[in-house]
């Protein structure tokens, strides 16, 4: 319903404001990975132009198959959470449990796309590799920004 959607939007806006105010570098990492996931994946799909599996689909997709956008997106989104988790969860046991669950979630999203018949396993593997590569490139920049922003805030 309309009020539910609007209140959900309001909660997201408030959460983004809090994250921006106190964790700007983490927000930078999320935005960076989201933009790359959207734009980069679309461009790669147009470059490779790989058709989807021809077997019976449980869902209908209208774009090309390689790389899997769900695999890229889940790797980037949940992978980003995995990387910044130490900021938010100090208890090592709880943090490890959450990290394991997020890792299983990333894997299961890939498996579900194969099960639904909309991707080949290589599409999923390519999506995981692309997402992981972008995380490995973005994370050092995030760490540098985090250090600089934390240092600047202590100077004020």
Where do the PLM segments sit?
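Membrane-embedded catalytic cores of phosphoryl/pyrophosphoryl-handling enzymes
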Residues: 54-156
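Short, small-residue-biased leader/transition segments that mark boundaries at the very start
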Residues: 2-7
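Transmembrane alpha-helix boundary/anchor motif
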Residues: 21-22, 38-43, 80, 136-137
């Amino acid at each position: 319903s309309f009020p539910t959607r609007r209140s959900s939007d309001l909660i997201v806006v408030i959460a983004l404001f809090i994250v921006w105010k106190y964790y700007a570098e983490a927000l930078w990492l999320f935005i960076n990975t989201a933009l790359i996931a959207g734009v980069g994946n679309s461009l790669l799909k147009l470059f490779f132009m790989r058709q989807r599996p021809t077997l019976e689909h449980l869902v209908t997709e209208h774009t090309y198959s390689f790389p899997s956008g769900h695999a890229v997106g889940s790797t980037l989104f949940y992978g980003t959470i995995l990387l910044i988790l130490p900021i938010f969860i100090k208890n090592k046991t709880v943090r490890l449990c959450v990290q394991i669950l997020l890792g299983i979630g990333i894997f299961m999203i890939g498996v579900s796309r194969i099960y639904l018949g909309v991707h080949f396993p290589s599409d999923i593997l390519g999506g995981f590799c692309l997402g992981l590569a972008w995380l490995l490139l973005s994370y050092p920049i995030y760490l540098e920004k985090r250090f600089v922003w934390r240092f600047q805030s202590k100077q004020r």
